C-alpha cells in the first residue's frame, strides 16, 4: 500500500476544496491514487447532496452575466438554505459559472420535468419519423427511441447538460458538488437568457 503523504493530501485538497480529513481518508481508501481519490470524494459529495436535497431553499440571489460582446445576457435565481451561503463569494462564482453555461449552451428548460408534455411528444414524433425514414423496424425504433430522448434531454435541459468547462460532469453534478461543499441544499429556481435579435 502506497504511503499517504502530506504533499498528496495538500494536492488533493487544492484540486477538490475538500476538507483535510476527507482528503486523507479518500487517499487511504484508494491506495494513495489521487485520481481515484477525486472520484471517491465526488461520489461521497453526491451522496451528501442527496441527503440535503429535500431541504427548503428560501435564501439566494439573482446572478447576472453579460457576454463580452454585449449581445447575450442571462439572469439566474440560485437559491440556498441560508443567507450566509448565498452571500459567499464561491456561491456567487457558482452562479456565474451556471450563467455562462446558459449563455453558451442556450438550454430551453431547467430540467426534464419542466419540458411541456406536448413538446416532448412532438420531439418523440419527429425522432420516430426520422427512424422510420431510415428504414428502421418498429421493434428497432422502440429500442433506439429512449436513447435519442435521453440525448435530446441532455441538450435542452440545463441540469442535464454537460458542463462547458468539464464535460465529464453535468450542471446537476456541479450543483451537487456545491451542496457537499457548503453543507446545505442549493437549487436553481429560474433562468432567463436574452439575445439581441432573439425572440
From Swiss-Prot:
Compartmental location: Cytoplasm
- Does this UniProt record's set of keywords contain Ribonucleoprotein? no
Record-level GO cellular component terms: cytoplasm
Principal localization reads: cytoplasm
Concerning PROSITE patterns, the annotation shows: EF_TS_1, EF_TS_2
Extract the Gene3D superfamilies matched here: 1.10.286.20, DNA helicase RuvA subunit, C-terminal domain, Elongation factor Ts, dimerisation domain
Pfam families, sorted: EF_TS
Q: Which InterPro entries match?
A: EF-Ts_dimer_sf, Transl_elong_EFTs/EF1B, Transl_elong_EFTs/EF1B_dimer, Transl_elong_Ts_CS, UBA-like_sf
| Single GO molecular function | translation elongation factor activity
Region Involved in Mg(2+) ion dislocation from EF-Tu: what ranges?
Answer: 82-85
Keywords attached to this Swiss-Prot or TrEMBL record, sorted alphabetically, are: Cytoplasm, Elongation factor, Protein biosynthesis
Superkingdom of source = Bacteria
The protein's job, in short, is: Associates with the EF-Tu.GDP complex and induces the exchange of GDP to GTP. It remains bound to the aminoacyl-tRNA.EF-Tu.GTP complex up to the GTP hydrolysis stage on the ribosome.
State the family named in the UniProt similarity comment for this chain: Belongs to the EF-Ts family.
Q: Which PANTHER family match?
A: ELONGATION FACTOR TS, ELONGATION FACTOR TS, MITOCHONDRIAL
Recorded protein name is Elongation factor Ts
> Source species, please?
Leptospira borgpetersenii serovar Hardjo-bovis (strain JB197)
- The coding gene here is tsf
